[in-house]
Amino acid sequence: MGPWSRVRVAKCQMLVTCFFILLLGLSVATMVTLTYFGAHFAVIRRASLEKNPYQAVHQWAFSAGLSLVGLLTLGAVLSAAATVREAQGLMAGGFLCFSLAFCAQVQVVFWRLHSPTQVEDAMLDTYDLVYEQAMKGTSHVRRQELAAIQDVFLCCGKKSPFSRLGSTEADLCQGEEAAREDCLQGIRSFLRTHQQVASSLTSIGLALTVSALLFSSFLWFAIRCGCSLDRKGKYTLTPRACGRQPQEPSLLRCSQGGPTHCLHSEAVAIGPRGCSGSLRWLQESDAAPLPLSCHLAAHRALQGRSRGGLSGCPERGLSD
Protein backbone atom coordinates (compact mmCIF):
# COMPACT_ATOMS: atom_id res chain seq x y z
CA MET A 1 0.00 0.00 0.00
CA GLY A 2 1.45 3.33 -1.11
CA PRO A 3 1.60 6.52 0.94
CA TRP A 4 -1.39 8.02 -0.88
CA SER A 5 -3.48 4.94 -0.12
CA ARG A 6 -2.53 5.07 3.56
CA VAL A 7 -3.50 8.72 3.79
CA ARG A 8 -6.80 8.02 2.03
CA VAL A 9 -7.63 5.18 4.43
CA ALA A 10 -6.65 7.30 7.44
CA LYS A 11 -8.93 10.11 6.26
CA CYS A 12 -11.90 7.77 5.88
CA GLN A 13 -11.28 6.19 9.27
CA MET A 14 -10.92 9.62 10.88
CA LEU A 15 -14.27 10.76 9.52
CA VAL A 16 -15.97 7.56 10.70
CA THR A 17 -14.36 7.91 14.14
CA CYS A 18 -15.53 11.53 14.41
CA PHE A 19 -19.08 10.43 13.56
CA PHE A 20 -19.09 7.81 16.31
CA ILE A 21 -17.56 10.28 18.76
CA LEU A 22 -20.41 12.68 18.03
CA LEU A 23 -22.87 9.88 18.76
CA LEU A 24 -20.96 9.12 21.96
CA GLY A 25 -21.11 12.78 22.97
CA LEU A 26 -24.87 12.78 22.36
CA SER A 27 -25.24 9.66 24.53
CA VAL A 28 -23.15 11.13 27.33
CA ALA A 29 -25.13 14.39 27.14
CA THR A 30 -28.39 12.43 27.42
CA MET A 31 -27.08 10.53 30.42
CA VAL A 32 -25.85 13.72 32.11
CA THR A 33 -29.24 15.36 31.54
CA LEU A 34 -31.08 12.38 33.01
CA THR A 35 -28.67 12.33 35.94
CA TYR A 36 -29.27 15.97 36.75
CA PHE A 37 -32.98 16.30 35.97
CA GLY A 38 -34.07 12.69 36.45
CA ALA A 39 -36.60 12.01 39.17
CA HIS A 40 -34.52 9.35 40.95
CA PHE A 41 -31.52 11.63 41.42
CA ALA A 42 -33.45 14.87 41.86
CA VAL A 43 -35.58 13.56 44.73
CA ILE A 44 -32.44 12.64 46.67
CA ARG A 45 -30.67 15.88 45.80
CA ARG A 46 -33.62 18.05 46.88
CA ALA A 47 -33.70 16.64 50.38
CA SER A 48 -33.52 19.72 52.61
CA LEU A 49 -30.91 18.52 55.04
CA GLU A 50 -28.35 20.61 56.85
CA LYS A 51 -25.63 18.56 55.18
CA ASN A 52 -26.68 16.54 52.14
CA PRO A 53 -23.93 13.95 51.41
CA TYR A 54 -25.15 13.36 47.87
CA GLN A 55 -25.35 16.96 46.68
CA ALA A 56 -21.58 17.50 46.36
CA VAL A 57 -21.10 14.23 44.47
CA HIS A 58 -24.00 15.10 42.21
CA GLN A 59 -22.58 18.50 41.28
CA TRP A 60 -19.14 17.03 40.60
CA ALA A 61 -20.55 14.31 38.34
CA PHE A 62 -22.67 16.83 36.42
CA SER A 63 -19.72 19.18 35.84
CA ALA A 64 -17.43 16.35 34.74
CA GLY A 65 -20.07 15.03 32.34
CA LEU A 66 -20.64 18.42 30.72
CA SER A 67 -16.90 18.98 30.32
CA LEU A 68 -16.46 15.58 28.70
CA VAL A 69 -19.34 16.21 26.29
CA GLY A 70 -17.88 19.56 25.28
CA LEU A 71 -14.39 18.15 24.68
CA LEU A 72 -15.65 15.18 22.66
CA THR A 73 -17.95 17.29 20.50
CA LEU A 74 -15.40 20.03 19.87
CA GLY A 75 -12.66 17.53 19.08
CA ALA A 76 -14.86 15.63 16.62
CA VAL A 77 -15.95 18.81 14.81
CA LEU A 78 -12.42 20.21 14.57
CA SER A 79 -10.93 16.92 13.39
CA ALA A 80 -13.63 16.38 10.76
CA ALA A 81 -13.17 19.91 9.43
CA ALA A 82 -9.39 19.51 9.43
CA THR A 83 -9.66 16.21 7.54
CA VAL A 84 -11.86 17.70 4.84
CA ARG A 85 -10.00 21.01 4.50
CA GLU A 86 -6.55 19.56 5.29
CA ALA A 87 -5.92 22.29 7.86
CA GLN A 88 -2.97 21.68 10.14
CA GLY A 89 -4.13 24.09 12.85
CA LEU A 90 -7.60 22.57 13.11
CA MET A 91 -6.10 19.09 13.33
CA ALA A 92 -3.84 20.23 16.18
CA GLY A 93 -6.88 21.68 17.98
CA GLY A 94 -8.78 18.41 17.59
CA PHE A 95 -5.80 16.47 18.91
CA LEU A 96 -5.66 18.74 21.97
CA CYS A 97 -9.38 18.25 22.68
CA PHE A 98 -9.07 14.48 22.37
CA SER A 99 -6.06 14.52 24.69
CA LEU A 100 -8.00 16.41 27.36
CA ALA A 101 -10.99 14.10 26.91
CA PHE A 102 -8.72 11.07 27.29
CA CYS A 103 -7.27 12.47 30.52
CA ALA A 104 -10.77 13.15 31.86
CA GLN A 105 -11.93 9.62 31.09
CA VAL A 106 -8.83 8.11 32.68
CA GLN A 107 -9.59 10.17 35.79
CA VAL A 108 -13.16 8.83 35.81
CA VAL A 109 -11.90 5.24 35.50
CA PHE A 110 -9.41 5.78 38.32
CA TRP A 111 -12.13 7.28 40.50
CA ARG A 112 -14.44 4.33 39.80
CA LEU A 113 -11.71 1.86 40.71
CA HIS A 114 -10.58 3.76 43.80
CA SER A 115 -14.05 4.61 45.16
CA PRO A 116 -16.57 2.28 43.51
CA THR A 117 -19.32 2.85 46.09
CA GLN A 118 -18.98 6.59 46.72
CA VAL A 119 -22.17 7.57 44.86
CA GLU A 120 -24.10 4.66 46.34
CA ASP A 121 -22.97 5.46 49.87
CA ALA A 122 -23.87 9.14 49.43
CA MET A 123 -27.41 8.31 48.25
CA LEU A 124 -27.95 5.72 50.97
CA ASP A 125 -26.66 8.09 53.67
CA THR A 126 -29.05 10.78 52.46
CA TYR A 127 -31.97 8.36 52.55
CA ASP A 128 -31.00 7.17 56.02
CA LEU A 129 -30.96 10.73 57.36
CA VAL A 130 -34.37 11.53 55.84
CA TYR A 131 -35.79 8.22 57.09
CA GLU A 132 -34.57 8.63 60.66
CA GLN A 133 -35.79 12.21 60.98
CA ALA A 134 -39.16 11.25 59.49
CA MET A 135 -39.57 8.32 61.88
CA LYS A 136 -38.67 10.45 64.87
CA GLY A 137 -41.42 12.88 63.89
CA THR A 138 -39.27 15.97 64.27
CA SER A 139 -40.54 17.54 61.02
CA HIS A 140 -43.53 17.10 58.74
CA VAL A 141 -41.37 18.07 55.77
CA ARG A 142 -39.19 15.00 56.31
CA ARG A 143 -42.24 12.73 56.04
CA GLN A 144 -43.18 14.32 52.73
CA GLU A 145 -39.64 13.92 51.41
CA LEU A 146 -39.56 10.29 52.54
CA ALA A 147 -42.89 9.59 50.85
CA ALA A 148 -41.61 11.20 47.64
CA ILE A 149 -38.46 9.04 47.69
CA GLN A 150 -40.47 5.87 48.24
CA ASP A 151 -42.90 6.73 45.44
CA VAL A 152 -40.11 7.37 42.95
CA PHE A 153 -38.12 4.22 43.77
CA LEU A 154 -41.28 2.13 44.32
CA CYS A 155 -40.05 0.96 47.70
CA CYS A 156 -41.06 1.25 51.32
CA GLY A 157 -39.00 1.48 54.51
CA LYS A 158 -35.79 -0.33 55.05
CA LYS A 159 -34.70 -3.55 56.63
CA SER A 160 -31.62 -2.90 58.67
CA PRO A 161 -30.35 -4.80 61.71
CA PHE A 162 -29.04 -1.51 63.10
CA SER A 163 -32.47 0.16 63.21
CA ARG A 164 -33.57 1.21 66.73
CA LEU A 165 -36.74 3.16 65.96
CA GLY A 166 -39.20 0.65 67.45
CA SER A 167 -42.76 0.10 66.24
CA THR A 168 -42.96 3.39 64.35
CA GLU A 169 -41.56 1.67 61.26
CA ALA A 170 -44.50 -0.71 61.15
CA ASP A 171 -46.93 2.16 60.58
CA LEU A 172 -45.00 3.43 57.56
CA CYS A 173 -45.72 0.60 55.10
CA GLN A 174 -49.32 -0.54 55.02
CA GLY A 175 -51.54 -2.06 52.37
CA GLU A 176 -49.99 -2.21 48.91
CA GLU A 177 -46.86 -0.43 50.09
CA ALA A 178 -46.03 -3.35 52.35
CA ALA A 179 -45.45 -5.53 49.27
CA ARG A 180 -42.76 -3.22 47.95
CA GLU A 181 -39.10 -4.01 48.30
CA ASP A 182 -36.72 -2.45 50.75
CA CYS A 183 -35.68 1.08 49.75
CA LEU A 184 -32.03 0.31 50.35
CA GLN A 185 -32.20 -2.56 47.88
CA GLY A 186 -34.20 -0.46 45.43
CA ILE A 187 -31.62 2.35 45.45
CA ARG A 188 -28.76 -0.13 45.05
CA SER A 189 -30.37 -1.89 42.08
CA PHE A 190 -31.11 1.40 40.32
CA LEU A 191 -27.57 2.69 40.84
CA ARG A 192 -26.11 -0.61 39.65
CA THR A 193 -27.90 -0.29 36.32
CA HIS A 194 -26.91 3.35 35.99
CA GLN A 195 -23.26 2.62 36.73
CA GLN A 196 -23.16 -0.22 34.20
CA VAL A 197 -24.32 2.17 31.49
CA ALA A 198 -21.76 4.76 32.59
CA SER A 199 -18.95 2.17 32.56
CA SER A 200 -19.92 1.02 29.06
CA LEU A 201 -19.91 4.59 27.74
CA THR A 202 -16.55 5.24 29.38
CA SER A 203 -15.00 2.13 27.81
CA ILE A 204 -16.33 3.03 24.37
CA GLY A 205 -15.15 6.60 24.84
CA LEU A 206 -11.62 5.49 25.70
CA ALA A 207 -11.41 3.27 22.62
CA LEU A 208 -12.72 5.97 20.29
CA THR A 209 -10.53 8.64 21.85
CA VAL A 210 -7.37 6.57 21.45
CA SER A 211 -8.27 5.88 17.81
CA ALA A 212 -8.92 9.57 17.20
CA LEU A 213 -5.57 10.49 18.77
CA LEU A 214 -3.71 8.07 16.49
CA PHE A 215 -5.50 9.16 13.32
CA SER A 216 -5.22 12.87 14.09
CA SER A 217 -1.50 12.65 14.81
CA PHE A 218 -0.89 10.66 11.60
CA LEU A 219 -2.90 13.09 9.48
CA TRP A 220 -1.21 16.07 11.11
CA PHE A 221 2.21 14.77 10.04
CA ALA A 222 0.83 13.88 6.60
CA ILE A 223 -0.51 17.41 6.09
CA ARG A 224 2.75 18.87 7.36
CA CYS A 225 4.78 16.77 4.93
CA GLY A 226 2.49 17.70 2.03
CA CYS A 227 0.95 14.26 1.49
CA SER A 228 -2.34 15.75 0.35
CA LEU A 229 -4.75 13.74 -1.75
CA ASP A 230 -6.63 16.74 -3.08
CA ARG A 231 -3.47 18.34 -4.49
CA LYS A 232 -2.20 15.23 -6.22
CA GLY A 233 -1.67 15.87 -9.94
CA LYS A 234 -2.00 19.66 -9.70
CA TYR A 235 0.82 22.04 -10.48
CA THR A 236 1.52 25.59 -9.47
CA LEU A 237 1.86 28.03 -12.38
CA THR A 238 4.24 30.92 -11.79
CA PRO A 239 3.47 34.22 -13.55
CA ARG A 240 5.74 34.99 -16.56
CA ALA A 241 7.44 38.31 -17.01
CA CYS A 242 5.84 40.72 -19.46
CA GLY A 243 7.23 40.35 -23.03
CA ARG A 244 9.15 37.14 -22.31
CA GLN A 245 8.66 34.28 -24.76
CA PRO A 246 8.19 30.72 -23.54
CA GLN A 247 11.19 28.45 -23.87
CA GLU A 248 10.98 25.75 -26.54
CA PRO A 249 13.41 23.04 -27.60
CA SER A 250 15.61 24.10 -30.53
CA LEU A 251 14.59 21.07 -32.57
CA LEU A 252 10.92 22.03 -32.26
CA ARG A 253 11.71 25.59 -33.24
CA CYS A 254 13.55 24.37 -36.34
CA SER A 255 10.65 22.17 -37.37
CA GLN A 256 8.20 25.06 -36.90
CA GLY A 257 10.44 27.75 -38.45
CA GLY A 258 11.40 25.75 -41.56
CA PRO A 259 14.78 25.41 -43.29
CA THR A 260 15.48 29.15 -43.16
CA HIS A 261 15.66 29.14 -39.37
CA CYS A 262 17.83 26.02 -39.44
CA LEU A 263 20.24 27.63 -41.88
CA HIS A 264 20.49 30.68 -39.69
CA SER A 265 21.38 28.48 -36.76
CA GLU A 266 23.98 26.67 -38.87
CA ALA A 267 25.54 29.93 -39.98
CA VAL A 268 25.78 31.13 -36.43
CA ALA A 269 27.27 27.80 -35.36
CA ILE A 270 29.94 27.90 -38.11
CA GLY A 271 30.94 31.50 -37.41
CA PRO A 272 33.16 33.78 -39.44
CA ARG A 273 36.29 31.56 -39.23
CA GLY A 274 34.91 28.50 -40.95
CA CYS A 275 33.18 25.23 -40.28
CA SER A 276 33.03 23.75 -36.84
CA GLY A 277 32.93 20.17 -38.15
CA SER A 278 29.35 19.43 -37.05
CA LEU A 279 26.06 21.26 -36.92
CA ARG A 280 25.14 22.37 -33.39
CA TRP A 281 21.57 23.11 -32.29
CA LEU A 282 21.22 26.19 -30.13
CA GLN A 283 19.26 26.39 -26.91
CA GLU A 284 17.99 29.95 -26.98
CA SER A 285 16.16 30.51 -23.75
CA ASP A 286 15.34 34.18 -23.87
CA ALA A 287 15.96 35.21 -27.50
CA ALA A 288 12.96 36.23 -29.62
CA PRO A 289 12.60 34.89 -33.22
CA LEU A 290 14.54 36.98 -35.75
CA PRO A 291 12.79 38.67 -38.70
CA LEU A 292 12.74 37.07 -42.17
CA SER A 293 15.31 39.53 -43.57
CA CYS A 294 17.92 38.30 -41.10
CA HIS A 295 17.24 34.69 -42.09
CA LEU A 296 17.69 35.52 -45.82
CA ALA A 297 20.95 37.37 -45.17
CA ALA A 298 22.34 34.45 -43.23
CA HIS A 299 21.27 32.06 -45.98
CA ARG A 300 23.00 34.12 -48.69
CA ALA A 301 26.18 34.37 -46.62
CA LEU A 302 26.21 30.60 -46.14
CA GLN A 303 25.74 29.98 -49.87
CA GLY A 304 28.58 32.42 -50.73
CA ARG A 305 30.99 30.66 -48.39
CA SER A 306 30.03 27.27 -49.73
CA ARG A 307 30.70 28.31 -53.35
CA GLY A 308 33.97 30.05 -52.46
CA GLY A 309 35.33 26.85 -50.96
CA LEU A 310 36.13 27.46 -47.33
CA SER A 311 39.30 25.69 -46.20
CA GLY A 312 38.63 22.51 -44.28
CA CYS A 313 34.90 22.79 -44.72
CA PRO A 314 32.83 20.47 -46.92
CA GLU A 315 30.37 21.95 -49.31
CA ARG A 316 26.90 22.11 -47.77
CA GLY A 317 23.60 22.57 -49.41
CA LEU A 318 20.04 23.05 -48.33
CA SER A 319 19.53 19.31 -48.24
CA ASP A 320 21.46 19.17 -44.95
UniProtKB/Swiss-Prot annotation:
Keywords: Membrane, Transmembrane, Transmembrane helix
Subcellular location as annotated: Membrane
Gene Ontology CC: cell surface; integrin alphaIIb-beta3 complex; plasma membrane
Pfam families: Tetraspanin
UniProt-listed GO biological process terms: cell-cell signaling; cytoskeleton organization; defense response to protozoan; integrin-mediated signaling pathway; negative regulation of myeloid dendritic cell activation; negative regulation of T cell proliferation; platelet aggregation; regulation of defense response to virus
Topological relation to the membrane, as annotated: Multi-pass membrane protein
Tissue: Expressed ubiquitously at low levels. High levels of expression are confined to hematopoietic tissues including peripheral blood leukocytes, thymus and spleen.
Transmembrane segments: 14-34, 60-80, 90-110, 203-223
Family statement drawn from the similarity comment of this UniProt entry: Belongs to the tetraspanin (TM4SF) family.
Protein name: Tetraspanin-32
